[in-house]
Amino acid sequence: MSFNLRNRSLLTVQDYTPREFRYLLDLARDLKRAKYARTEQEHLKGKEICLIFEKTSTRTRCAFEVACSDQGANVTYLDPSGSQIGHKESFKDTARVLGRMYDAIEYRGSAQKGVETLAKYAGVPVYNGLTDEYHPTQMIADVMTMREHSDKPIAEIKYAYVGDTRSNMGHSLLIVGCLLGMDVRICGPRSLWPSEEYMKIAKVLQQASGARLLVTEDPREAVKDVDFIHTDVWVSMGEPKEVWRERIKLLTPYQVNQDLMKATGNPQTKFMHCLPAFHDTETTLGKQIAEDYGMDNGLEVTNDVFESEANVAFEQAENRLHTIKALLVATLGD
């Protein structure tokens, strides 16, 4: 391997250097080609991987399980009811138990401190599958997707994230672009901007990489000439209806619709979303949002944009598999 990432955890977007991040992208590309050509070699035979999900998931779980299967590893899945972590057993104690049984641990939950504690005490690589602060495995897939759909070098790609920018996706897209020297636009109402903690991290990385960074409340300014527009959901299950009402009112000007796509001035602009997306009324929650708030053509993205040729969210979802596989092979592979 060109880089030695063996036994390294991935807890935040900035854990790896730009060169290491690009190495993962190249490895993911090679593994994707091998899977399509049916020439893939197993590098994880006999490895045991534990997946801890305090928050449910479709893409992250499936990507880890298929990646492990393709590479010859075994998987144990612990769902929200299948683990005592944080309830009857501390993160520290859980780490010291699982680290003796498994070669690596993935954790998806709320607390960034939790995944960091696992990594500190497990003695094996730990991967952040999502916390309230960061979504680092998603970032590898997002940059891979942007590279696949652009003929520009990574550092010349322009993208905007529009919506609630204080979210894990907002933090992560802010930081990954600054890490890799990209043209990054972060756009949302000022009250939902990333905190100073994340801005400081981004600015340090920006100075090192030469990234261009714009944080603005103006969606048209943010999307001008971009190659990609990213967004994410505005609301989450379990939140009070009052919170939904206020946030939807605040974020409605930041909906990704045809007008915003045209405002880029670039007919080749692609739409990206980590999914799931509330773009129609074919889900229980989508129907509820339409009935309660009159948003029957989608919430954070309209259905016509989501169903258009501009949408690369499903390629983005597939790339979760290839990039997570690259992470596993790079950190555990023989």
Swiss-Prot record:
The residues listed in the UniProt record as binding L-ornithine, with positions renumbered to this chain, are: 168, 232, 236-237
Q: Which Gene3D superfamilies match?
A: Aspartate/ornithine carbamoyltransferase
A Pfam short name = OTCace_N
Q: What is its main location?
A: cytoplasm
Q: What is its EC number?
A: 2.1.3.3
MF (Gene Ontology): amino acid binding; ornithine carbamoyltransferase activity
- Compartmental location: Cytoplasm
| GO biological process terms held by the UniProt record | arginine biosynthetic process via ornithine; arginine catabolic process to ornithine; citrulline biosynthetic process
InterPro entries reported for this sequence: Asp/Orn_carbamoyltranf_P-bd, Asp/Orn_carbamoylTrfase, Asp/Orn_carbamoylTrfase_sf, Asp_carbamoyltransf_Asp/Orn-bd, Orn/put_carbamltrans, OTCase_ArgI
Biological pathway: Amino-acid degradation; L-arginine degradation via ADI pathway; carbamoyl phosphate from L-arginine: step 2/2
Q: Where does carbamoyl phosphate bind?
A: 57-60, 84, 108, 135-138, 274-275, 320
Does the keyword section mention Transferase? yes
Job of this protein = Reversibly catalyzes the transfer of the carbamoyl group from carbamoyl phosphate (CP) to the N(epsilon) atom of ornithine (ORN) to produce L-citrulline.
Give the similarity note. Answer: Belongs to the aspartate/ornithine carbamoyltransferase superfamily. OTCase family.
Under PANTHER family, the record lists: ORNITHINE CARBAMOYLTRANSFERASE (PTHR45753:SF2), ORNITHINE CARBAMOYLTRANSFERASE, MITOCHONDRIAL (PTHR45753)
The entry's protein name is Ornithine carbamoyltransferase, catabolic
Q: Which gene encodes it?
A: arcB
